[in-house]
């Protein structure tokens, strides 16, 4: 993973000045970010800009979980692979190769980044709606690998909306799911707040039935994130 981390950091150094110029980004609660140790970073997902916004404010290398179809997008697929991106099917299924990649992240005490909503919020295409239902894969990673979760949220202060630059037919030829081909609009951030909360201890969720604990942990993370969205900062 050292090569991927170096590629990630080089890309971050290249992109950061342009992103910082285009978007007014303010981060709060960064004192909650542990400087070392394995961790799962979760956030809401309302724009294709989200991983870049979070990476801009997060000081450590993030191994991002991404929908497997994004690894078929020209240019992006190569950058994602070089930077250590980990593909996952939109139905939540994950290949053995990807599971091994996740385990390697935790073995080296790294950070796994994942959006519990998947692409569902963007598919819904209502940018004023609350977060959609969470997929519980991130909770399974936490419990099975005994890893704490760091909740975060991206709160748009100013944004605009534009048509998806890739036509629907082209997206279909690229192998994207129909619901992704049907997305009409995307959010373009102008000013955002990124808020990090205290990490959530995985240990209370190790005892008892896994299925019950997945829901409990997922619900706890959602509540924490909703509270962060309502946090007033000055």
Stretches found by the model and what they are:
Residues 206-228:
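C-terminal/domain-terminus segments
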Residues 8-15, 99, 197, 214-222:
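Short, amphipathic alpha-helical "lid/cap" segments that border enzyme active or binding sites
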């Amino acid at each position: 993973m050292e090569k991927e981390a170096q590629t990630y950091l080089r890309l971050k150094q290249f992109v950061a000045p342009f992103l910082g110029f285009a978007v007014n980004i303010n981060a709060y609660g960064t004192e909650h970010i542990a400087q070392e140790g394995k961790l799962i970073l979760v956030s809401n997902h309302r724009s294709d800009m989200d991983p870049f916004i979070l990476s801009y404010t997060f000081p450590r290398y993030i191994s991002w979980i991404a929908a497997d179809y994004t690894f078929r997008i020209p240019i992006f697929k190569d950058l994602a692979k070089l930077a250590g991106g980990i593909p996952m099917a939109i139905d939540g299924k994950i290949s053995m190769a990807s599971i091994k990649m996740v385990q390697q992240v935790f073995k080296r005490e790294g950070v796994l980044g994942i959006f519990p909503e998947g692409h569902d919020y963007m598919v819904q295409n209502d940018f004023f709606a609350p977060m959609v239902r969470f997929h519980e894969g991130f909770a399974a990673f936490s419990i099975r690998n005994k890893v704490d979760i760091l909740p975060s949220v991206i709160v748009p202060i100013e944004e605009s909306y534009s048509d998806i630059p890739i036509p629907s037919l082209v997206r279909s030829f690229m192998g994207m799911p129909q619901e992704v081909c049907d997305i009409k609009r995307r959010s373009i951030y102008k000013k955002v707040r990124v808020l990090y909360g205290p990490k959530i201890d995985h240990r209370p969720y190790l005892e008892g039935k896994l299925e019950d604990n997945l829901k409990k942990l997922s619900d706890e993370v959602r509540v924490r994130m909703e509270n962060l969205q309502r946090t007033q900062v000055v």
